[in-house]
From Swiss-Prot:
Encoding gene per record: UGT76E7
Organism encoding this protein: Arabidopsis thaliana
Name under which the protein is recorded: UDP-glycosyltransferase 76E7
Keyword Glycosyltransferase: yes
UniProt similarity note: Belongs to the UDP-glycosyltransferase family.
Keywords: Glycosyltransferase, Transferase
Amino acid sequence: MEEKLSRRRRVVLVPVPAQGHITPMIQLAKALHSKGFSITVVQTKFNYLNPSNDLSDFQFVTIPENLPVSDLKNLGPGRFLIKLANECYVSFKDLLGQLLVNEEEEIACVIYDEFMYFVEVAVKEFKLRNVILSTTSATAFVCRFVMCELYAKDGLAQLKEGGEREVELVPELYPIRYKDLPSSVFASVESSVELFKNTCYKGTASSVIINTVRCLEMSSLEWLQQELEIPVYSIGPLHMVVSAPPTSLLEENESCIEWLNKQKPSSVIYISLGSFTLMETKEMLEMAYGFVSSNQHFLWVIRPGSICGSEISEEELLKKMVITDRGYIVKWAPQKQVLAHSAVGAFWSHCGWNSTLESLGEGVPLICRPFTTDQKGNARYLECVWKVGIQVEGELERGAIERAVKRLMVDEEGEEMKRRALSLKEKLKASVLAQGSSHKSLDDFIKTL
């Protein structure tokens, strides 16, 4: 028995090949590695992460799939993930079989991103323990469930029709409106629901890990626990649970830290819309005018390829944008370092879940401009539940942008949000310390292995 336990040490992890999913999966891997487990990370050729030297203790293996990069653009993320699942199932099963034959260590469990749902079917054939990792919020998980249930009852008319009806509240999901449900700008409601049916299916999963904190989402976690009828572990924020090396798919420009060093405390608004958001040229120019008119210092991340519908190059567009010496623009930034910097007083964000947790973890209030899917619900919670955010809705217009920036950076309302954000920061810090809820959840999960 002792020999069997000592060999049951390897954990296999399967992330979605996207920045917002890879990062928390690697953070979880680091947490498990710190507890004595060996780690194997299964990647696709698409968006392959070139591991840093800090991850040299991890084994990285690749599923041989043949999806062209153009598929993501042509199909949209939802349909692309469905195609990826169909493409990877057989090769993943073969790879898993090889791991079982070749490895000296037994596999304790396979942890897969909920959107890599094909893993559950493959793992089941080998009778291995499998665990779902949700890299979105618990509330987003609930919303996906509810969308599937409403769709089955033809109850998503408000979302399909748009207009005034989409601002109606979803029954029993206050303060979520129909427009806040995690539908995608890249896909129809029907396509989104098709994907969510797969992600919400627990199959033979023994448990679910969610990158969240009980103090933020207690009611959603309790809802999921009752609905799924398997243990739900809130182990987050994962970036605070353990120190992990950068896993950025884009090169980070650290010159912005030197620029921040020259600014006054809480005087800079950091602007970043994530690794996937697309913007029209007109929107980008309106943002530039709004930020400059606010008379606030700003650090702005403009990702290559993020401006669509432009007849001129991004370099030419940047020249057209009247940026004063109060502004600093980079293509990509070391976000956790930026948010932790004393000069940063606010974050204009797309409200992806990682960005949301990183901002709350540093006590930085947000201006919320969600783009798609779960970002909309996150923004709603930031504004209406946690009260540390201001949502900018509708068409982007320079006056509205200027007013939002001043509300957060100048007005008393912003000071109150900052105080609430700092209070949440302390609660999140406490959750990952010994006796904290997330620390206990991680220990409880490890005991099951």
